[in-house]
Amino acid sequence: MDSSSESYHKIEVIYLLSKGAEQDDHPHMIQVQYPSHQHAPTLRDVKFRLTALRGRGMPDSYSWSYKRSYKGTFIWCDVFDGDDILPLSESGEYVLKALEVMDSSEDACDRGVEHLGQEVARVLPTNRNGTSANFNEVHSIDDVRRVAPNKCVEVKRQFMGGSVHNNMTGKANRNEQGDAYGTTSRVPDPENCIENKRCLESMTGSDSSRSNISTDESYGLSFERDLKMDMKEMPACPATRSTDHGGMSSLAPRSSRLSRREYVKCKTWAVKEDENAALNHGRLSRRSSDTLRDSNSVGNTVDIPSSPVTRPCFPGDPLIFMLKKATKFHRSQLCRKAEVEGSPCATVGKPSSSRHTSKIRHGSGPLKAYHGPHSSKSATQNSRPVTYETSAKESERDIRSLCQFLGASNVGSVSQTINKEGTKKTGSARHIQAGSNDDFDFARHKEVAVDISEKLLLPEQVTGRYEKPSRMSKQLINKLDSKSLNMVTRPAVRLSSKLGSGQASESFSPASPHAPQRPIVSRPQEKAVNQLSLVAGFEDPQITSSDTSNAGLSCTSKASGLKAVKLPRNASNNCYFSLTIPDLEKRAADTKVYPWRENSAFNSIELYSGTLQKVDLAINTSFNGATLGELASGGC
């Protein structure tokens, strides 16, 4: 620093201009003069020099601070106009830093917003008085009938500025008119709109608006004349816009060109199909009518508006839709009730679970069991058992729903017919009904009818003496069919047993056509020991009851001269039944009957030697029965 004899001193000042916290400009150096009576230059002296160099207002747009040492480091000390600027202690230099002042009025963002507002103000239309349009006076029209046409025109004129428009506003109006009316400029017919609205309200059941439409008939004619006069002046009226954008649905304009096929969303019909287990297995069918509908088949395409609200209102459309739906339904699907006849002498408990076989053979002839409302052909091919229950206090005829009646169709049962021509030897069984220990409990029974063809019987059973069967007879016996042995069964109560599935013989396999699985019914615990009665009888006098044996786990009883044998009350639940044939008694104990399987039609005896034959026998069981009914002639 050089001193002079003048009244001013000159110093060199280095300053840095910064427009941001992290952005610094290249340093500049200027010479500053200050009076000699001052100890150091001030910020006012620096600004005076910068005004002469950079122009007026430049120094005031920055905030200034000088660099000084502080505790072994450097800091920036802010100064004002009258503050002194101190040099660095090491070098004696004057270093200043200028930061741009953040003024809200001069902010770039605010300047951009202000500029954008000015551009928008130039585009907005003005009224005749030169002022901007008042948007608070523009209202959306919800109902055309409630607003006078003159008022609607006045609002549009005020919004569009009357006849004073610039070129940009005119182009926008023409584009909006093209979007609203499509390729045609036809005037909407208010009478057709009133008829469509009346049809729509008749479907929804609104009676209040129906009276309003009838009273506004004369008003619609005057409204049509006003629309024709002022249509050119109100091209963008919200009441005439398309209904797809949330506008009015009653004044939807017609469309001169419609697609030949339109997607129509109709109702969805839920129909419960016939719950036959052999066909449907209880599935539900939902049929939806979301299909393509040809607009030419419904009516004239010119008279059909494009509004989705008024489309279902055309005459004949709902009727045709219902007729098409009605023709698709089958008779079994329309049936909702079924009548089930209850047996007056048979009451069966409701099953808790059920099983059925996959294949069941059937013969030809009249049915012996009731299988629900099916034809004879369907019962022969896909016959399913029907388990039903009736109370002693209820009437003999019980009406149930189709779902409840067919719900038990999964229960397996054998329904076979009797061939009267090829049947000569017949064994039958009657109802065996036993009273329960509980007075309020229902009686449980099983009825089995067995038909044994003559060619299936052994020679000694027919002639009374033993004869060795021929080769042809063995072939006939080995190939049993449903016509030679036919049985009819009814549901019965399953007897609880602890036997496992491993004790079942080969003749009781589920794949066997004569071994269906019976329903499982739970019964209450009783104090008395269960009693099992096995009854068998034949019409042939050569076959006596001496050839019949009844056995249990712990005891075996044989009877002679009787056609029916009853086990004592303390007999075990697991009983064996065998039919002994002369000279073949040693094989009789090999074939067992397990009551826990509850098979009412099965191969009870299966002999494996060359002289042995297969004979099917039916067993009648009754639980808690103290006595048996009288046996009829030729049967039990």
Curated annotation (Swiss-Prot):
Main location: membrane
Localisation per UniProt entry: Cell membrane
GO terms classed as biological process: cell division; plant organ morphogenesis; protein polymerization; regulation of cell division; specification of plant organ axis polarity
The entry's keywords: Cell cycle, Cell division, Cell membrane, Developmental protein, Membrane
Molecular function GO labels: protein homodimerization activity
Cellular component terms per the entry's GO annotation: plasma membrane
Stretches for region Disordered: 164-188, 281-304, 340-393, 499-524
Pfam families: SOK (PF06136)
Family, as annotated: Belongs to the SOSEKI family.
Name the UniProt record assigns to this protein: Protein SOSEKI 2
Name of encoding gene: SOK2
